[in-house]
Amino acid sequence: SVYCMYGNKALRIQKRKLRQKLNSEDHKKRGQAVFNHLAMTELLNQVRVLGAYIAFDGELDLSPLIKSCWKAGITIAIPQVQKSRLIFRNYTPNSKLVKTELGLLAPKADVRIPLQKLAAILVPLTAFTKKGDRLGMGAGYYDRSLKEVPDLIRIGVAHAFQEVSEVDTHCNDVTLDAVVTEKRFVITSRRGKSLPMLQYAR
């Protein structure tokens, strides 16, 4: 739709500008807050292989979470674009990071992890709704890849200001099971309350 082309494009630009304005102290605090929210759920108790990302363009910083996962023996898988799909590589404290063609950082030569091995994935985004609609950067890499593994638990990671009341659903990205921001953890209506990994730990 026309709105899809122009409305979503304008929304992406607006939200990206907001997150690019944050300073390193903001990023540090927000990254820690996101980790604190996720640490209250069963996710880190149950997951063995977790998809994550290395922050770029003002995205929410997952460093505190990733470091905690390493200590707990959880394998971290980081995406890399290959032939318009995402492939995932094991990311360890010893990984050498290289800048890929899109300007993203990815582990250079670490072991490839099949998407089917991931139990959950933390997905960056430019805008989201509380129903779990996600607007990405527009290239569709996550959409194409995640549609191949419908059972994979998808958790959007965003700044609270990236929440909107709606995004155009004719062209929006894959739906999310939950969204975590620096302010809260929201289970969306996609598969909602039925996922044990997303419940608060007792």
List PLM regions with ranges.
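Intrinsically disordered, low-complexity segments enriched in small/polar residues
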Residues: 1-4, 51, 139-140, 198
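N-terminal active-site beta-alpha-beta segment that forms phosphate/nucleotide-binding
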Residues: 3-117
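Conserved phosphate- and dinucleotide-binding cores of soluble alpha/beta proteins
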Residues: 86-202
